[in-house]
Amino acid sequence: MLARAIRVRPMMRGIASSSVWNRNRPIQSSLMQYCRDRSLRLQRLHGANLMVQRFYSRKRDDSNGDIIMGPDLMSDQDTHLPATVAVPDVWPHVPLLAMRKNPLFPRFMKIVEVSNPIIMDLLRRKVKLNQPYVGVFLKKTDGEEELITNLNDVYNLGTFAQIQELQDLGDKLRMVVVAHRRIRITGQVVEDVPPPKPVKMTTLHYPLFNIKLQIPAEDQSTDQADAAPIKSRSDPARKPRGRIPRSRTGKSRESAAAEELIQNQTLEPPLKSGKVESSSLPKPPTEEKIVEPETGAKENVNQSAPSAQPVLIVEVENVKQPIYKQTEEVKALTQEIIKTLRDIITMNPLYRESLQQMLHQNQRVVDNPIYLCDLGASLSAGEPAELQKILEETDIPERLQLALTLLKKELELSRLQQKIGREVEEKVKQQHRKYILQEQLKVIKKELGIEKDDKDAIGEKYREKLKDKVVPEAIMTVIDEELTKLNFLESHSSEFNVTRNYLDWLTSLPWGVISTENLCLEKATETLNDDHYGMEDIKKRILEFIAVSSLKGSTQGKILCFHGPPGVGKTSIAKSIARALNREYFRFSVGGMTDVAEIKGHRRTYVGAMPGKLIQCLKKTKIENPLVLIDEVDKIGKGYQGDPSSALLELLDPEQNANFLDHYLDVPVDLSRVLFICTANVIDTIPEPLRDRMELIEMSGYVAEEKIAIARQYLMPQAMKDCGLTDKHINISEDALNMLIRSYCRESGVRNLQKHIEKVIRKVAFRVVKKEGEHFPVNADNLTTFLGKQIFSSDRMYATTPVGVVMGLAWTAMGGSSLYIETSRRHIRQGAKTDPNTVAGSLHITGNLGDVMKESAQIALTVARNFLYSLEPNNLFLEQEHIHLHVPEGATPKDGPSAGITIITALVSLATGKPVRQDIAMTGEVSLKGKVLPVGGIKEKTIAARRSGVNCLILPVDNKKDFEELPTYITDGLEVHFATTYEDVYKIAFTDVTETTTNNVEEQEPLQKLSSAAAAKSETWPYS
């Protein structure tokens, strides 16, 4: 509490002495007003807009006669401490002050802030009227609102408190309130505040004292009218005034009278800020009245006031002090509470300070169980309802028990807090100790020469990494320059980290480190055969590479490109090659890549810059001659960040990759010993310069015999191992595999075949676990129970080929396929011949054909007309009739020139009315003069013909060499004819065919069509 002192000037003492104590004349009201204003003016803070008011009496100070202001210590034994204001025993009407979290207990103080304007105005008026009393009650809900609209929102029992100090901050009031006793709400009071009256001021002049005073006009009085009458000594109503002997205070009677005059006057506070002390008892409120009904009869007010009327002032009554006896139970509870308080203070020093603030001098807590209960409740942080229960409890033993319960909870909380604090402190202490020891160890090592500075250690580490490597001289020069630069940089700078990362990459590369290759042909052959079936071309090329390396005595790099349909083993054969050559394997895909920096790296100036994939490969494999697989090279992208396919030109050029320059390293790196293998499905999308740098090796699709062998040797054992089955659980017959390949897995690769085999084995494993049996044979009869309905029913749409229909052969990225060319005569109604598309001899084409195939159809029509004219001059069918040409399936895009001879044959068959041989299929491009030109995909087309059950093939004569390279298990049983002109094709296709009587025969109904699953495929079938 702050101590304030009001010094009264000697002149005022003289005035008080001559005017009051000598009884020369009654003191004038103007002089009283002057004394009052003078004392208040001395109390104001310099320039502060705060109103601080305290309500104390005072005791005489013998030193200088000043009035001493001090904190309320609630003790009368020390004469040097100020005495407290005498609090009235009964105060029926008090402003209601609602508390949120915990109640205020008697004899304890609390700082309260109020921001509601209505409550602030009420408290200001009460303080100005010297009525600094409030009723403090706990709210039932934890709301933020300060203004109560219903008495049911607060608990009925609270405390009567005195505003000991008040600070007016403008937007809120900050008060120090001290509780005195328990009170109970009996009703609500509505306050009527009259409006302020205008005050007329007048000036009084006292020449004797050289004083001019501004006072209200009604206060200007004379001895007869306005002066306050002084009662005689004999008047019984006159209140006796306490006198202090002169010998005790050492002051003059006049000084004491002046001080007492200032003390006893009822001073009203100024309108602004100020500090007022008064020892006189405040008068009972006169401006308040209880709300009465309109009839004029007074009636009690209910506890619940209307919600529209805010509860500002309540009518209260004192709660009687409970009577108790000092029983053994009370003594035991008291001692236990004191012991618990002692334990809490011992564990948490913060409670010691709180307790010292709560306790008063010379106050024995042990002697007062009521105060002890309130003390324990104030120290604890219990729930508001629990604290309110202690406040309302009237039975002292029960109140002690409740307070003890809260203190025990607080003690346990303090123990837990102490435990957590010890653990955290111990952890921090260990970390700090470890840090100090590490720093000391660094200093000791540095002094002994065991450890060098960080920069020196970094340099030694890099030189140690280059110890067993053959670093080129140009590279070593760059490393030395960077190490020198590193020594001059601050370790916390960004350039230091950039240089350090750069040195990390330079020293991590395998300069001159080469792995020992396997140059044994037998071992390499065994490794390749163990992993893959067939692929003789690839295996032969790898063995040639080993043979050349063996003769030269050194290894070299090569650039190979495996292209073929998906699932034929392009990626897996690369792993086998790496194992056969004893080289490290590294794979990265360039499918969809659009950033050149992925291959050649980023510039070091960029944040997070890294080298390209090839430098990362060398760092990971730690050798200069790994096998690098560049997957999906035909699907490489192109964007605004550059063209990665152009960046591959330097990488895949044997003449340039010996000095490959990465953007990040910016030093030449030798990649000439790296074996590059690229994979692609088609080579048409690969740029010509890049394709020219690679050695292309075609990987064709598998025929049924190859698929069966792969399934028996590789797929089934691996799938059974993965599912935990053995041969005693499952047996897949040869018929089941044939049906699986023919009806479910017709693609060129074996990836789909692997999925179906795994599906069958998983279902068998499920049945084994369910104990439905121990052995499950899989054959053609029960295969549908494992895989469902067949996807492909037949490759042939017609059992007997009708007139105008011929089977052709196509090649796709998925392998070979057979398809039909259908032609038919269009019947044009009258009136439609004016359409240019329906002129005589027109050709209507459908089937989702590309431009190349449409041009091929027009060429075929011209060749067919010329050939038919030479064969049957009188046959004008192709010149006069409207022809419709269709290539199923309509949803599948088709393009390419290789269907030329097939379209001519279909048109000739339609014009002559002769069907072709039933077991024939053909492919070949035709020129305008009827010459048959070579096509590609002979192996795939031959496989498709065998799959469709065709026995006779017509191929261009220039493709004879391609057919002769095919394995015998593909060509066995086939009747193959090689045509030079279309006349050769006609002789083979219409051999031993009897002419029909009609010149135009409509198509027969197809025997079987592909199922919906096969028809849903949308791959492009280019006739190459």
UniProtKB/Swiss-Prot annotation:
It comes from the Eukaryota. One of its GO terms (cellular component) is mitochondrion. The keyword S-adenosyl-L-methionine does not apply. Residues 285-297 have a biased composition (Basic and acidic residues). The active site is at 898, 941. InterPro entries: AAA+_ATPase, ATPase_AAA_core, Lon_bac/euk-typ, Lon_lid, Lon_proteolytic, Lon_Prtase, Lon_prtase_N, Lon_prtase_N_sf. Keywords: ATP-binding, DNA-binding, Hydrolase, Mitochondrion, Nucleotide-binding, Protease, Serine protease, Transit peptide. SMART domains: AAA (SM00382), LON (SM00464). GO terms for biological process: cellular response to oxidative stress; chaperone-mediated protein complex assembly; mitochondrial protein quality control; mitochondrion organization; oxidation-dependent protein catabolic process; positive regulation of protein catabolic process; protein quality control for misfolded or incompletely synthesized proteins. Residues 94-411 form the Lon N-terminal domain. Changing residue 898 to A: Severe retardation of TFAM degradation following mtDNA depletion. PROSITE patterns: LON_N, LON_PROTEOLYTIC, LON_SER. It is found in: Mitochondrion matrix. Its EC number is 3.4.21.53. Residues 219-305, 999-1024 are annotated as: Disordered. ATP binds at residues 564-571. ATP-dependent serine protease that mediates the selective degradation of misfolded, unassembled or oxidatively damaged polypeptides as well as certain short-lived regulatory proteins in the mitochondrial matrix. May also have a chaperone function in the assembly of inner membrane protein complexes. Participates in the regulation of mitochondrial gene expression and in the maintenance of the integrity of the mitochondrial genome. Binds to mitochondrial DNA in a site-specific manner. Belongs to the peptidase S16 family. Homohexamer or homoheptamer. Organized in a ring with a central cavity. This is Lon protease homolog, mitochondrial. The gene is Lon.
